[in-house]
């Protein structure tokens, strides 16, 4: 999958991967985010950071959740 090309499919894929890896409970916040309503480059950055790590401290999980809230335009 080429994530460099912005698409709704890529947004959905990255959000699913992020929320699964972080074991987020309140994933409804990120459901149905439209491509034009998110900062796509910021989403890619968050996705790549999360993908590289295998474990997260509670503080890191909180920070990532805060950043995910900020990606909305």
Swiss-Prot record:
It comes from the Bacteria. Belongs to the UPF0435 family. The lineage of its organism: Bacteria, Bacillati, Bacillota, Bacilli, Bacillales. InterPro entries: UPF0435 (IPR009507). This is UPF0435 protein lwe1727. Pfam families: DUF1128 (PF06569).
């Amino acid at each position: 999958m080429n994530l460099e090309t912005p698409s709704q499919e890529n947004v959905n894929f990255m959000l699913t991967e992020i929320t699964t890896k972080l074991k987020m409970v309140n994933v409804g916040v990120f459901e149905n985010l439209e491509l034009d309503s998110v900062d796509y480059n910021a989403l890619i950055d968050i996705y790549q950071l999360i993908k590289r790590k295998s474990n997260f401290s509670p503080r890191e999980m909180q920070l990532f959740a805060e950043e995910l809230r900020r990606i909305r335009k």
